[in-house]
Amino acid sequence: AVITGACERDVQCGGGTCCAVSLI
């Protein structure tokens, strides 16, 4: 997971789906 200002795609969410919006 990377800190971004948008929806992040990560395998931790289940197959690289847009699952969370990171807050800096």
UniProtKB/Swiss-Prot annotation:
Q: Which domain of life is it from?
A: Eukaryota
**What InterPro entries does the entry give?**
Prokineticin_domain (IPR023569)
Q: Which GO terms describe its cellular component?
A: extracellular region
- Which cysteine pairs make disulfide bonds? C7-C19
| Listed name of the protein | Prokineticin 1-like protein
Localization (cell): Secreted
Keyword annotations of the record: Amphibian defense peptide, Disulfide bond, Secreted
Using the UniProt record, give the first listed, main subcellular location.
secreted
SUPFAM superfamilies attached to this UniProt entry: Colipase-like
* UniProt tissue specificity: Expressed by the skin glands.
